[in-house]
Amino acid sequence: KAREMIQELYRYYNRHANRMPKEYLELIDQKAQPQERVVCDYIAGMTDQYAIDRFAEIFIPKAWRG
């Protein structure tokens, strides 16, 4: 399940890079690194709980959350 969650976050942030923090967007804008690498770095820097929270915020309808 964790792998699938990370894969979904990766796909999401590759399609919606503008949802990442400003410092990551600047790396993409400056062409310092390819977007795919920046997305990987962003996700790799997440704590487990932060990744779970982002996943829930993005993919789980609010009415389903407790």
Predicted regions and their residues:
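Histidine-centered, transition-metal-coordinating active-site segments
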Residues: K1-G66
